[in-house]
Structures are given as C-alpha cells and as structure tokens.
Amino acid sequence: MKDESSFFTIDHIIELENGQSIRVWETPPKSDTHKKNSTIVIAAGFARRMDHFAGLAEYLSSNGFRVIRYDSLHHVGLSSGQIDEFSMSIGKHSLLIVVGWLRAKGIQNLGIIAASLSARIAYEVINDIDASFLITAVGVVNLQDTLEKALKYDYLRLPIDELPDDLDFEGHNLGSKVFVTDCLKNEWDTLGSTFKAVQGLNIPFIAFTANGDSWVNQSDVEKMIDNIDTTQCKLYSLIGSSHDLGENLVVLRNFYESVTRAAVALDKGSLDLDIEIVEPGFEDLTSTTVKERRLRNKIENELLELA
C-alpha cells in the first residue's frame, strides 16, 4: 500500500465478482512514530460503522500502527447490501475478504481487534487466517444468551415460520429468518460452538470484558479462555463500562487506551499492559472524527447519485 501518512484516511474499495463492494478505510501510522510490526484490522460491532472507531484508529496510528477498518456487507455503512439480509456468515465472509485483500497486497503481520458481535466472528476464523494476535472487547461468546438479553426474548428457540419478519436490534431491523436460519445451520448460537472455534488457538490473545456488561457473562468468557490450551491468553476488565463502550467519554477513553496498550504489548510479544503509549490530543480526535464524517457523507451522496 502507498504510504500517504499526510492524509488522514485513505478510502479503498474492494470490488467483488457479483457486483458488490466492500469499503475499506486505511489510517497510516503517524510519520513521527516508530512503525510497529503489525497492521491492525478492526471489526466493528453490530450496527457500528467503521467511522465509529475513528478515535481508536487515531490512538493506534499515533502509536505506530497501520489501521484497517471496513464495513461488512449487508450492514450499516458504506459497503453493499441491506442490514435486513445480514447474517453471521456474511460477517465472516466480509472479514475473510478483507484479510485476503491485505494478503494480496503483501501485508503478512495482521493483528485483529473485534468488538461485540464481530468478536464471535473473529473467534470463528482466527485459527484459519494466520493472524499475529487477537484482541476482543465485550466479545460475544454465547450468541443465543446475548440475543435473548438484548431482544428480551429467546427468538432462536422459535420455529422459523413463527419468527417476526424483523427484529429491532440496536435500532436497526435485523431480518429474523435470514439471521436465525444462519445461526442454527452454521452453529453460531451456543457457547460450545465458540469453545470449538477457538480450540487450539496458538497466537497471543487478550480479551476485555466490561464489569457492567449485561449482555455478555464474564464467566462465559473465562470458561472460553480456560478451554484454550495455551499460556498466551489474558483477560482484563474495563471497569465502569457497560456493553456500550461509547456510553460516555470516560469509558471511551479507557477503551481506547486499554486496547492500544494491548496492541502495543502484543506486537512485542507481551501480555502485560503496564506500558507507555502515545495519547493523541482531544483536538486531533475531534478533527479526525469530523473529517471522517464529512468523507462518509460525501461517499453516501455519491452512492445515492449512482443508485
């Protein structure tokens, strides 16, 4: 990839054979930092666009990382498709396309950061993509349990023909039949399926839970880590946070700092977060957020003109 460190965000498009496309944003490492070994791929949580992680990208790039973000197919954001057709397998497919695209560009050392629902997707593929390390934040490990808590009802137990057309999840209409059918057919739903996916994990892995998370049981995350036969895993808690990592500025800053420390540590082969990092200024974070919002609006307007 071309080094365009002076430009705040580089917009890429992965064109697929079926006419769909995945939008990717690249944040190069800051020119005045020591470049890290790994390129970071951020997989945002459900109903979160890649620009929601502008602040985290700014933190990571200020500490020497090239950062890659993307919007999944059939999701909110700038990639093709509608969210009522989203499924876990489509999320998996999108992540694998982005990883393959980076490999084709000669980028070998990839660190994966995944939040919430995307963490369950990362757990599913992590043993197959030859990543350098994995970081998850409020990562879903028992999808059926999390969905029941989020939706106030266990829809995965209903027969498919009794499901409502859409489920209101995080303020978006999730196509229930598409999503639930995929969950059951491809075994995304249980804690045991997550155990199976991460069994044999042999790369460094740090998981962050939130002590106020009502959607993910920390005990389930602990069981998952205990199920991994390695000493390269560590669990940390984001004190004072709920499942919503952006609920206030204090929680958000703690999330940015903690995940950045984890990335810097893992890039050096350590699991210890007691390290110094560069913290970007509030003005830099605000400027990046505003610029990315303008870029997103510009792209959305262009897509509307083409429709």
Curated annotation (Swiss-Prot):
Its domain of life reads Bacteria
- List, alphabetically, the SUPFAM superfamilies matched: alpha/beta-Hydrolases
Molecular function (Gene Ontology), one example? acyltransferase activity, transferring groups other than amino-acyl groups
What GO terms in the biological process aspect are recorded for it?
bioluminescence; fatty acid metabolic process
What Pfam families has UniProt attached to this entry?
A: Acyl_transf_2
* Catalytic residues as annotated in Swiss-Prot or TrEMBL: S116, D213, H243
**What EC designation does it have?**
2.3.1.-
Q: In which pathway does it act?
A: Lipid metabolism; fatty acid reduction for biolumincescence
Keywords from the UniProt entry? Acyltransferase, Luminescence, Transferase
Q: What does this protein do?
A: Acyl transferase is part of the fatty acid reductase system required for aldehyde biosynthesis; it produces fatty acids for the luminescent reaction.
Matches recorded under NCBIfam families: PRK13604.1 (NF010127)
Q: Hey, which family's this protein in?
A: Belongs to the LuxD family.
Question: What name is this protein filed under?
Answer: Acyl transferase
Give the species this sequence originates from.
Aliivibrio fischeri (strain ATCC 700601 / ES114)
